Amino acid sequence: PYATQPREGRGKDAADWYRINPHRLHLGVVGFEGLNPAELTEIDQTLDLMDGVIRSSFTTEGEKIAVTTACDPDADRFTATIEGKKHLPIAIRFAYPTGAHTDDASNWAADEKHSTELVASTEQSATLLRTIDTARYYVRLDWTGKATIAQKGRNHFTLTPEEDRWTIAAHFTPQETKATAEQQDILAVEGAATAFWNNFWMKGGVVDFSHCTDPRAKELERRVVLSQYLLAVQCAGPTPPQETGLTYNSWFGKFHLEMIYWHQAQFALYGHEDLLLRTLKWYHSAADGARHIAERQGFEGLRWMKMTDPDAMEAPSKVGSFLIWQQPHLIHLAELVYRATKDEAVLKNYYDLVMKTAEFMYSFATYDEANDRYILKGIIAAQETLRASENVNPPMELSSWHYGLSTAQLWRERMGEPRVAEWDTLLAKLSPLAKDAEGKLYLASEDATDSYTNIRFISDHPAVTGALGMYPESRLLDKEIMNNTIDKIFEVWNWDETW
C-alpha cells in the first residue's frame, strides 16, 4: 500500500493531518521595539561574508544607530552589539504556529493559545519558558551593561538598555539554561563566528571568474559565492533542509529528500564534506522508517521517503509517494564524501545504508521477460506531469538506477566483498533511454511518444536532461542524442510552467 491522499471523508482528513503534522515552529522575533520603518533614514546594511557578520546602521529622530549581528556556529544563539546615544528598547516577541503550507509560520492573532513565562533572571540575564500546546522550549537572554526587562504582553517582552554601547544575546534551546550571576561569555560569539567563516573560505574552494571575458562573469561570480554562504547557513543542519531553507516556510516546514542533492552535494565538491556529513547522519535514524515503507510495499531494503520530517515519518501524497529519484541520493552523497576524504571510516559508516538502498533498487525494478530487459514503472517521474499508471522508464530515473547500483557494487569491492551477481544482471539489462521514432531525441518516458508536442510533457521539470546532467555518462545514453534533446527543449519548452 502507498501513502496516498483520499479525496474525501475520514481518509482525506487523516491524510491532511499527517501532511500538516508535525510542522515547523517559529521560535521568536528579536528586534527594535516600536520603530516605524518609514521614519528611518541613512539605512545601510552589509553582509561581511569573510567574517560572517552583518553590519547595519540607520538614523532615527536624528540619532545614528549601528548594529553588528553574529550567529554562534555551535549553538542556536546570536548576538547583536548596538551603538547609539538613543537607547532603543529591544522587543522579544513570539507567535503561534500556523500549520499552513507556505508562509512565515507566524500567527500573531492567537495569543491565548500559547504562553511565555519569565522563569529566571539576574541583572544581566533572563530565561523565558515557551509553551505551545505540548511543545516547550527556552530562550536564554544575556546582555552587557545595565538593562531592564519588562513584560508587555502575554508573549511580548522588551529589554531597554542604559548604555550607549551594549550587546544582547538570545539562545534558543530545548533545555533550560539556568540564569546565574556569572554571565555567559556572549562577547566571544562574534569571534567564534569570524573564526568559523574565515576557516570556511580558506579551507574550501571558491569560484573565480576574474579571467572570463564575458561581461556577465562578475555578477555570476557574486551570485555563486553568495550561494555558497547561503547554503552553508541554511542547509547544513542535522536534518535535510526544507526546500526554502530557514528563511521561509514551505510544505509545512517538512523537507523533501529528492531535493537534498541540489542543496548539499556541492559541499563535498567545494571541500566542505564535514557540513554534508552533519546531515547524512540523519539517514541512520531514518532507516527504520524507510525499511517499513519497503516492507509494506513488498520490496527489499530501504525505500527512502519523499516528504518527511525529523522523525522520518512519510507524509501522504498522491504524487510524492510514487517518486523514486530521491532513492539513489544517499549512495550518491556518500560516494562524494568518500571521494573527497578517501576515509575508510566513511565506507564503514555508510556501507549498510548503501547496500540496503541498493537492495530496494534491485527489487523495485521489473523484469520484462518478453524483451529480456529491466524496466522502471509504477512511478511518477521527476517531471511530475507523467502519471504513475502510464509512466515507463523515465530517463533520469534510469540513469540514477544505473549509477546507484554501479556505485553500490564499487563499494562492495572497496570493502573486499564480492559483487552481487543479480545486480550486475540488472545493470547489463537495464533499459536504455527511450528515443523518438527517428532516433534523434530522448523522450520524457517510453510511453510519452508525443514528448515535444503534448503540453503536458513540455511542462514541469525538463528532467530528461538530468539523465546526463546529474549522473555520469553510461551505456544507457548517447551524447549526440542528448545534445539534440537539449536543443529541442530550448526550442519548445513551456518555460512559464517549469521549475
What are these model-derived regions, one by one?
Residues 1-254, 273, 284-291:
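Acidic/polar, glycine-enriched structural segments that form the non-catalytic walls/loops
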Residues 208-217, 221, 239-253, 263, ...:
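Primarily short, surface-exposed interaction patches in extracytoplasmic proteins
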Residues 231, 274-278, 284, 291-296, ...:
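Structural recognition of the beta-strand scaffold that forms the well-ordered cores
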Residues 231-239, 254-256, 275, 288-293, ...:
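Secretory-pathway/luminal and periplasmic proteins that interact with or process carbohydrate-rich
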Residues 244-254, 298-319, 372-396, 440-455:
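Carbohydrate-binding/catalytic loop surfaces
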Residues 256-289, 310-313, 323-340, 344, ...:
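Active-site core of glycosidic bond-cleaving carbohydrate-active enzymes
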Residues 356, 360-411:
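Acidic/histidine-rich catalytic neighborhood
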